[in-house]
Amino acid sequence: MEFPSKFTHKKMVGIIPLDGFKNDWRLPYSPYFAPIAEGLTLIDNAVLQCAFAGCRQIFILCNEKDVKLLRHNLGEWVEDPNWWWKKTVDHQAAYRVQIPIYYIRMSEKDKRQRGSAAWGIISTAMTANRMAGFASKWTAPAKFFVTFPWTATPFWDIGKHRATSVARKKVFYSHEGRSAWEGEYLPFTFDQDDLRKIKKNFRKKNTLTYRMVADYEPGSNSWFERLPKEEQRSGRFFTVQQLVEPINKNKLFEIELNKYYNVFTWENYKMAVADYSFKRPKSRYLKAGQESRILQRIGVNESE
């Protein structure tokens, strides 16, 4: 289904890729479950960044083995902070908005052939489009907000710029002159036109097992040759910096962040924890204790 380039709505969907990274901290659990503050993990902080930025839905690309733990810790929705303290209504609780969280995975074929975080972002955006397409192509996201568990930025700082990130067509976040275009794990947004561009760029640069060396000849194998093993399936090593190359950075609105740590490495993670700038919100935006945050299934009674 071909999705429109322009929408009358401003629906923004959050994308958090957890799969496709090669950092191994030698922990008994995945690195994004590491705490950055008391009661706040790296993935919690990323989900809150999406919520504070103004996302209507959040898609988390993860390993299948981690889904159960993620659903246990996060549930299937997070509160929209913008509606939590609405003062224009008499009963605040009745008008609160829940942002659904969807857990998806890369197919085994994708993991073998192009299993990078960059392709994970593309496939997650396509999944969001497919889900919207079941209703109508006009319900597809107008733009996508990408953040990472390695983006150690206080979610409050993202929330300060919510009006800008929602109203502007596209934005990107920077710190000290660096952004995703310089290889940092900083948030950025892209629209449907950009999605088509980055897909085309990925497929153009991604190598397969063989390459063509001459014109196609039926019944002959002289027109292709096998690539060296280290050059095969280059999409597996595609970086986020390569992903955003087709997007013209100068056409995006820049938002400067005061604080940011790239916690992809253990050394930077220790620096972020030692900063004491990260705190779990007192308001119950996230799942707390034994609270059940399971979305009601359509056509299914709660007792079933």
Regions found by a protein language model. Name each.
Residues 1-11, 90, 133, 142-143, ...:
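N-terminal donor/sugar-recognition subdomains of glycan-related enzymes
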Residues 2-14, 36-40, 67-102:
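Short acidic, glycine/proline-enriched helix-loop-strand junctions
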Residues 17-19, 63, 149:
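Cofactor-binding loop segments of dinucleotide-utilizing enzymes, especially the Rossmann-like FAD-
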Residues 57-63, 173-174:
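Short internal beta-strands
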Residues 80, 87-204, 298:
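Conserved beta-loop-beta/alpha segment of the NTase-like Rossmann-fold superfamily
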